[in-house]
A protein has these predicted regions:
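A phosphate-binding catalytic loop at a beta-strand-loop-alpha-helix junction
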Residues: 139-153
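Active-site-facing substrate-recognition patch
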Residues: 1-75, 110-136, 146, 171
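Short glycine-rich phosphate-binding loop at a beta-alpha junction
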Residues: 74-86
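Acidic, metal-coordinating catalytic cores used for nucleic-acid/nucleotide bond scission
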Residues: 83-92, 118-119
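Short helix-loop-beta junction
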Residues: 99-108
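Short, surface-exposed alpha-helical segments at coil->helix boundaries
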Residues: 91-95, 99
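A short, conserved beta-to-alpha structural element at the edge of catalytic cores
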Residues: 115, 154-172
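A structural signal for isolated positions on well-ordered beta-strands in alpha/beta enzyme cores
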Residues: 78, 138, 164-166
Length: 172
């Protein structure tokens, strides 16, 4: 999709030009891969997170990446998304992306499998709502800001054979 060309009206509104820029990053003990990055012009994050069309676009790009990255097939893999905020109801961007990825590569998607015990965004504590039997897990986060969500998810799942952290937009 073509990015909307306008500058942010406020300092708070973040934008993405939707030009793919796959990058590897390190945060604490983990490495994560981002598909896109924040930009000075483009579509606002809030608009992106409300768009089913852009969820399909992000999922297609993620599948293309996964086909190149996961060698030997998807047997034993599943996908989860980082916990959704409790006050958000209705369309959920990450859930839509993960549903599309899971269908395309034929792996289980554990929707709402991880929940946050605290409201603290900088030091969240997560727990599993249900068991995840697969030992290889793709953890998807739509927009990374501080990285604390990925680190908390890592602490919860670090006993697994493989963890692949995939981020839609790196907001750093």
């Amino acid at each position: 999709p073509e990015a909307v060309k306008y500058k942010s009206w406020s300092h708070q509104e973040r934008l993405c030009d939707l030009k793919e820029k796959v990058s590897l990053h390190k945060k604490g003990d983990i490495y994560y891969i981002s598909q896109f990055t924040r930009s000075k012009t483009g579509t606002s994050f809030s608009e992106i997170k409300q768009s089913e069309e852009l969820a399909s676009f992000f999922a297609e790009r993620a599948c293309e990446f996964l086909h190149r990255f996961i060698v030997g097939g998807y047997e034993g893999w599943c996908i989860v998304t980082t916990p959704r905020r409790r006050h958000n109801e209705g369309f959920h961007f990450s859930t839509s992306i993960c549903t599309k990825i899971a269908g395309a590569v034929k792996i289980p998607f554990y929707e709402n499998a991880i929940q946050c015990l605290t409201k603290d965004r900088l030091n969240p504590e997560f727990f599993l709502l249900r068991p995840i039997k697969e030992k290889k897990i793709i953890v998807y986060d739509d927009i990374l800001t501080t990285g604390s969500t990925l680190l908390a998810t890592y602490e919860l799942l670090k006993d697994r054979e493989q963890l692949l952290f995939l981020v839609g937009i790196n907001n750093k």
